[in-house]
């Protein structure tokens, strides 16, 4: 490995090295780099502006200020190149060496490098086993430290105060032991680091052996952890070959002067880089210290000077890390070397990862309705500027000019020849258009420029969705790809016509929107009594002729013979069929075409006819849509907002219901929380009903006309109300917004997210009164504030995702994985949310998929499941399929083609080299920003579903109960007494049609084996509270329910009634409970076990029964109020997604069972309840294998004695903890849970993302294992290692006949995972730069430049896509353009003749 500083000699080709290593620099190394010592703090002479000799800008050390000219002016020009001037000592050479030559400062005393001292954990402290506090005392000259105790009783590394040191000198004499303070002492200690006893060897390797031995003997966990930490640092030194004393600085490098320039301003002042100030401080203090040492000054003065020097060096390396921040004259902290690297403005992110580009311009965009999909309009003036070099070249080639200078003049005069040449230059030369923020790869696309007058760029309307652009003043940037390779990539990979499908979900992203949809929708609608209704035509051509002649209307219903069949259709649809590819059947468009249908049409065309046809179709649809939208002449008038007639009655009814509930509350029948929830529900329901009435009235109309027999006739038909048309077609607006215009605005949310219980009953058409307007402003403002915040949050989420997934690249065809995941339909609450077909499309089958009945192979193992095969699978009635997945891919680096499956943006299997990690990150991050930007459109109107409190079946069939235990009340009703019971509806053959989970405390309205009709009520429950129910009849006895201690009687101010609620008590032994006694006062036993009928009450439970009441089995004895619902919005969303990907532990997470078994309660300890789960083996309970869990007092335990629980099931209420799921259920279950949870957030917003993207991120989060048992491997206990490194090391040890290490899978959040990547360059450019670099330097890390980020930073091509190693040797041959043009012209001529 070459020394990196040879970089500074001549610019190297970035491809000439394959890895880069970082390590500590020794003092000799620094002197070797240096071109001379900087002795004086002076910079330049302010009169002559010449650099001072031996100063910070010295020309002798760093090189001449002007090219080939020495300082005193004796030697000038090229002919003296390489001479060293004997007068001023300057070498005659180019001045740019001042950007690469280093100097050095020799320090009078060694100084600690602050990174290794203060970056936690302190490396120097760890190595010497001294605490940071003590270390600082020594370094900043406050205490002495024993370096060599010799014969005395001191320990090596012991601290002595001034008094103690003097006493010891008196006691033992001067030579009896050596102690010191300041840098020299620490340097001495570091030089002598080694084991306590000689048996382990010498120096650092000896120390490592000793620590390993100690670790084997260590008894306590804490001690083992401490040793492991120290061992980690020691091992790093052993492995890297760094010497510990190099963490102390004896020589400091001075960076080249042109990297810390001094610029004269007008008025004789100078602007300088902060580094010069920091270096000046160091030199001043160093020189002063040298002088004091020569003068033999008193100890105390020298000590003070040493401390100041240490502080000055600290500030130079990392200002503000320790002590006071050093500020400049303007009270601004000085920017130290570390600050140059850190943060968004640091070297990494500002200059290495993002650079400014030449050949670019930006301008406002306007719509270009007549452009083809692959074109964009480029203003002539812009094109002239961007393509200048090409124009100069052509002008010279054609002989118009002889020199570049004259070419320049010609272009400036804008002569006619220039415009001709410009036309020729830009023909077929694609340009890239980019709209900021670029949230996914479709934010940059390539187009062929068309020259236009004016100053605005014209954009094709169909690509607006991808860019998220609109024409209200958006700007876009244009970039010119210069090289042939770049042009080729732009054309093949980035052309807008090659990006029809979205990489996020694989559906078209080039879809008609707004006016286009409106026009197509309008032309495919049918209008009653239109001119020419009922006519019959022999062919589509006849229809067209009749329409052109004005014989039939666009929306008239007619009969036409199509492909030999008579079809009933409308004129508009026949005209639309004219532009659709012939492969598509007429049925595909013989319906009202709204936005969804149009997306389906484009999708279908893409699958059946390919890319080219799709592009042509898109352009034709665009033109036809715009044309018909114009002809439709749709406008909005006040009268179009139809307020439903029934609104008044509905509102009156709701007010009455609310009054009833208020009355119930006043009588004390319900709690304040239930009242609030019920009121909210009533209003939510009424708002819905008003909206439905309104949509009903606005959505249909009665058409009057003359029937066939000439009589007046009325017909109902879908309305032609413009507002309805816009919403129904999907062009603009939603039912939600129309509701606010013409229905009622409904419930609003407070900024805290609670719902205000008085809704806004008015709509915008009627107008709001002052109070209503005021309530509205709440929501609207919150929307705007949220938008600003969430955009930033979302961007940050995307950045973290990209960082963690940037090295997930497709690297091989097949990893040979034998494992996969099982996918079925996604069902929630008995409804199929996502059918299985959608989830398995484009994946690769793991095993043969067989038809359940015939046993035929539908899909072979390792075949892609495409649209056709999905149909086969769905028709065969298979409900679960095993597929290959990124999660189980065995590729050592990256991912293999088979496990990934289809590249969604191309609709075929993924290519090798595709950067699927980045695509996944963009697909997840992009909608985050979209959603955040879209919150305020509804103006904070609260959207909330009425709580589900019943189960209805959708299909008729037979009822079957699965794991349902019930209590029968005396009136015969059945109450469900456990939590994980299910009601299953089966058909006559006994096949399961649907399945519903039933809640604890629900009232069953059906019995086992009962026949039910469709949509029958099966069960109902109280949605607002969780009941605690007794299983036996008897008399209530309170236990530990003491007023004011464990229960409080709260008297309601409004109703004056008292209600008892359990409160948290100070007494740790109090166990509030209710027991059920029999006549003799003995506690009753539960029916199915020998446990007592005792019910523990969690905090917050409301008591429903009094002491001594008689109760029946199935009665409610206490209620737990459920939280009042907050509005569901992506606010729950974005932070939720971040929380999931960061793998945070929820605050109040549920304890889950680690085994299957039967629940029992043990003795309480320390005020916590003990739940014991006993497993069954072969039908027998095995108490020896039981697991115990302690659950905090006041938490609601959701299992009961005798319940059977499965592993991974929650024992109490609370959020799931992903780390628990991983530990108990394993990686696949965790991955499934994460995918479902993330998807749920996006689904609420109607955003589609393919599962495989989330899986890709989860794979990156699960890359590591934690070592539990080291075996004979090189690992340390509790160390986190990459999975594959772990497997390789184990293989090595097993081959040698040793014992393998044991590890447990580890789930890292995305930030942690990014920081722990193998590449230190990538990690340091992400976050915590200094920490990452400190660690990397000590362990002498090597970065093999495998990820994308490291390569961008090193200025190489990324190892993905066309930059992949496999494609490196391909060269592109260019035909001379002249031949190509001639060939093309010949071909055209031949084509024309044919």
From Swiss-Prot:
This is DNA-directed RNA polymerase subunit beta'. The RNAP catalytic core consists of 2 alpha, 1 beta, 1 beta' and 1 omega subunit. When a sigma factor is associated with the core the holoenzyme is formed, which can initiate transcription. The gene is rpoC. Its cofactor is Mg(2+); Zn(2+). It comes from Anaeromyxobacter dehalogenans (strain 2CP-C). Keywords: DNA-directed RNA polymerase, Magnesium, Metal-binding, Nucleotidyltransferase, Transcription, Transferase, Zinc. Mg(2+) binds at residues 470, 472, 474. InterPro entries: DNA-dir_RpoC_beta_prime (IPR045867), DNA-dir_RpoC_beta_prime_bact (IPR012754), RNA_pol_asu (IPR000722), RNA_pol_N (IPR006592), RNA_pol_Rpb1_1 (IPR007080), RNA_pol_Rpb1_3 (IPR007066), RNA_pol_Rpb1_3_sf (IPR042102), RNA_pol_Rpb1_4 (IPR007083). Belongs to the RNA polymerase beta' chain family. It catalyses: RNA(n) + a ribonucleoside 5'-triphosphate = RNA(n+1) + diphosphate. Zn(2+) 1 binds at residues 70, 72, 85, 88. GO terms for molecular function: DNA binding; DNA-directed RNA polymerase activity; magnesium ion binding; zinc ion binding. SUPFAM superfamilies: beta and beta-prime subunits of DNA dependent RNA-polymerase. Binds 1 Mg(2+) ion per subunit. Binds 2 Zn(2+) ions per subunit.
């Amino acid at each position: 490995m070459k020394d990196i500083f040879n970089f500074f000699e001549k610019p190297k080709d970035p491809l000439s090295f394959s890895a880069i290593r970082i390590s500590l620099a020794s003092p000799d190394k620094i002197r070797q780099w240096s071109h001379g010592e900087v002795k004086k703090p002076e910079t330049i002479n302010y009169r002559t502006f010449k650099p001072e000799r031996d100063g910070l800008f010295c020309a002798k050390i760093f090189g001449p200020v002007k090219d080939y000219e020495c300082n005193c002016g004796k030697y000038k020009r090229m002919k003296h190149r390489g001479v060293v001037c004997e007068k001023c000592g300057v070498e005659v050479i180019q001045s740019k060496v001042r950007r690469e030559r280093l100097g050095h400062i020799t320090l009078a005393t060694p100084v600690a490098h602050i990174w290794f001292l203060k970056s936690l954990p302190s490396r120097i402290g760890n190595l010497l086993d001294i605490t940071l506090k003590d270390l600082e005392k020594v370094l900043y000259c406050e205490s002495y430290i024993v370096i060599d105790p010799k014969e005395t009783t001191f320990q090596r590394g012991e601290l002595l105060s001034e008094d103690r040191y003097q006493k010891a000198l008196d006691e033992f004499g001067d030579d009896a032991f050596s102690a010191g303070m300041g840098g020299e002492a620490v340097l001495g200690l570091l030089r002598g680091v080694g084991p306590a006893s000689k048996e382990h060897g010498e120096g650092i390797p000896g120390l490592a052996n000793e620590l390993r031995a100690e670790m084997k003997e260590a008894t306590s966990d804490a001690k083992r952890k401490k040793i492991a930490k120290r061992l980690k640092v020691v091992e790093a030194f052993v492995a890297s070959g760094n010497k510990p004393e190099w963490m102390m600085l004896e020589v400091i490098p001075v960076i080249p002067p042109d990297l810390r320039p001094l610029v004269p301003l007008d008025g004789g002042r100078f602007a300088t880089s902060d580094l010069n100030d920091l270096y000046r401080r160091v030199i001043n203090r160093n020189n002063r210290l040298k002088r004091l040492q020569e003068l033999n000054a008193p100890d105390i003065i020298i000590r003070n000077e040493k401390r100041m020097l240490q502080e000055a060096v600290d500030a130079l390396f990392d200002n503000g890390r320790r002590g006071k921040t050093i500020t400049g004259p303007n009270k601004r902290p000085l920017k130290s070397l570390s600050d140059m690297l850190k943060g968004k403005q640091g070297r990494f992110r500002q200059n290495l990862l993002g650079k400014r580009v030449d050949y670019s311009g930006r301008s406002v965009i306007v719509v270009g309705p007549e452009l083809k999909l692959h074109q964009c309009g480029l203003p002539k003036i812009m094109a002239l500027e961007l393509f200048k070099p090409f124009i100069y070249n052509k002008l010279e080639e054609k002989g118009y000019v002889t020199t570049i200078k004259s070419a320049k003049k010609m272009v400036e005069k804008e002569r006619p020849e220039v415009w001709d040449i410009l036309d020729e230059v830009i023909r077929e030369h694609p340009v890239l258009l980019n709209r900021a923020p670029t949230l996914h790869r479709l934010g940059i696309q390539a187009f062929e420029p068309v020259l236009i007058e004016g100053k605005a760029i014209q954009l094709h309307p169909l690509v607006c969705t991808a860019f998220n652009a609109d024409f209200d003043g958006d700007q876009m940037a244009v970039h010119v790809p210069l090289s042939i390779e770049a042009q080729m990539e732009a054309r093949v990979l980035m052309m807008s016509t090659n990006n029809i499908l979205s990489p996020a979900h694989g559906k078209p992203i080039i879809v008609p929107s707004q006016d286009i949809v409106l026009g197509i929708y309008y032309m495919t609608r049918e209008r009653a009594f239109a001119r020419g209704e009922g006519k019959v035509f022999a062919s589509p051509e006849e229809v067209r002729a009749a329409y052109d002649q004005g014989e039939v209307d666009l929306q008239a219903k007619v009969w036409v013979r199509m492909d030999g069949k008579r079809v009933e259709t409308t004129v508009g649809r026949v005209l639309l069929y004219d532009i659709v590819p012939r492969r598509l059947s007429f049925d595909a468009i013989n319906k009202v075409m709204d936005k969804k249908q149009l997306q389906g049409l484009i999708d279908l065309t893409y699958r059946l006819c390919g890319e080219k046809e799709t592009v042509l179709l898109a352009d034709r649809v665009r033109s036809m849509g715009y044309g018909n939208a114009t002809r439709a002449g749709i406008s909005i008038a006040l009268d179009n907002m139809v307020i439903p007639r029934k609104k008044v009655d509905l509102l009156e009814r709701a007010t009455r219901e609310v009054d009833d509930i208020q009355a119930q509350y006043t009588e004390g029948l319900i709690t304040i929380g239930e009242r609030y929830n019920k009121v909210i529900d009533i209003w939510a329901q009424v708002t819905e009903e008003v909206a439905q009435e309104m949509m009903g009235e606005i959505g249909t109309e009665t058409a009057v006309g003359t029937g066939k027999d000439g009589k007046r006739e009325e017909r109902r038909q879908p309305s032609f109300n413009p507002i309805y048309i816009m919403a129904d077609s999907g062009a603009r607006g939603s039912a939600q917004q129309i509701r606010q215009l013409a229905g009622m605005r409904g419930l609003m949310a407070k900024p805290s997210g609670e719902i205000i219980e008085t809704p806004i009953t008015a709509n915008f058409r009627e107008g709001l009164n002052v109070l209503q307007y005021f309530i509205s402003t709440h929501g609207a403002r919150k929307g705007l504030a949220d938008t600003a915040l969430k955009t930033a949050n979302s961007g940050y989420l995307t950045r973290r995702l990209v960082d963690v997934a940037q090295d997930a690249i497709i690297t091989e065809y097949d990893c040979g994985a034998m494992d996969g995941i099982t996918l079925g339909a996604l069902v929630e609450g008995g409804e199929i949310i996502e059918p299985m077909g959608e989830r398995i499309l484009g994946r690769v089958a793991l095993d043969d998929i067989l038809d359940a009945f015939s046993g035929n192979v539908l899909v072979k193992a390792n075949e892609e499941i495409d649209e056709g095969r999905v149909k086969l699978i769905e028709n065969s009635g298979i409900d679960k399929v095993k597929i290959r997945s990124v999660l189980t891919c065995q590729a050592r680096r990256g991912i293999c083609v088979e496990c990934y499956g289809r590249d969604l943006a191309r609709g075929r299997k993924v290519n090798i080299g595709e950067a699927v990690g980045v695509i996944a990150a963009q697909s997840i991050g992009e909608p985050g920003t979209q959603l955040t930007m879209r919150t305020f459109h509804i103006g904070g109107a609260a959207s909330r579903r009425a709580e589900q409190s019943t189960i209805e079946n959708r299909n008729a069939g037979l009822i079957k109960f699965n794991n349902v235990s019930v209590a029968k009340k005396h009136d015969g009703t059945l109450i469900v007494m456990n939590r994980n019971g299910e009601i299953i509806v089966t058909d006559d053959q006994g096949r399961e049609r649907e399945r519903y989970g039933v809640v604890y405390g629900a009232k069953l309205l059906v019995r086992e084996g009962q026949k039910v009709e469709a949509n029958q009520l099966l069960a109902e429950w109280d949605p607002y509270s969780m009941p605690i129910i007794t299983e036996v009849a008897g008399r209530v006895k309170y236990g530990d329910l003491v007023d004011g201690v464990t229960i409080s009687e709260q008297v309601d101010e409004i109703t004056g009634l008292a209600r008892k609620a359990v409160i948290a008590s100070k007494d740790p032994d109090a166990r509030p409970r209710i027991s059920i006694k029999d006549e003799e006062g003995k506690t009753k036993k539960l029916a199915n076990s020998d446990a007592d009928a005792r019910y523990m009450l969690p905090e917050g439970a409301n008591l429903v029964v009094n002491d001594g009441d008689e109760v029946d089995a199935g009665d409610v004895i206490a209620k737990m109020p459920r939280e009042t619902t907050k509005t569901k919005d992506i606010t729950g969303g974005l932070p939720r997604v971040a929380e999931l990907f960061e793998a945070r532990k929820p605050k109040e997470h549920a304890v889950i069972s680690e085994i299957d078994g039967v629940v029992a309660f043990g003795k309480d300890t320390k005020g916590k309840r003990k739940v014991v789960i006993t497993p069954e083996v072969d039908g027998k309970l095995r108490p020896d294998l039981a697991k115990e869990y302690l659950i905090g007092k006041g938490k609601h335990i959701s299992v009961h004695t005798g319940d059977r629980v499965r592993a991974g099931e929650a024992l109490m209420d609370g959020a799931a903890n992903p780390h628990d799921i991983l530990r108990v259920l394993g990686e696949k279950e965790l991955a499934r849970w994460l995918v479902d949870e993330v998807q749920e957030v996006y689904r609420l917003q109607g955003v589609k993302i393919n599962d495989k993207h989330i899986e890709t991120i989860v794979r990156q989060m699960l890359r590591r294992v934690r070592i539990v048992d080291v075996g004979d491997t090189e690992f340390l206990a509790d160390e986190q290692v990459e999975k594959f490194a772990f497997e390789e090391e184990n293989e090595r040890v097993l081959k040698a006949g040793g014992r393998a290490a044991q590890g447990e899978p580890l789930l890292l959040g995305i930030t942690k995972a990014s920081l722990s990547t193998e590449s230190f360059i990538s990690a340091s450019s992400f976050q915590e730069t200094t920490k990452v670099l400190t660690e990397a330097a000590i362990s002498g890390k090597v970065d093999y430049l495998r990820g994308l980020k490291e390569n961008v930073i090193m200025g190489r091509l990324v190892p993905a896509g066309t930059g992949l190693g496999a494609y490196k040797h391909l060269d592109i041959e260019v035909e001379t353009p002249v031949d190509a043009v001639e060939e093309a012209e010949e071909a055209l001529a031949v084509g024309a003749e044919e």
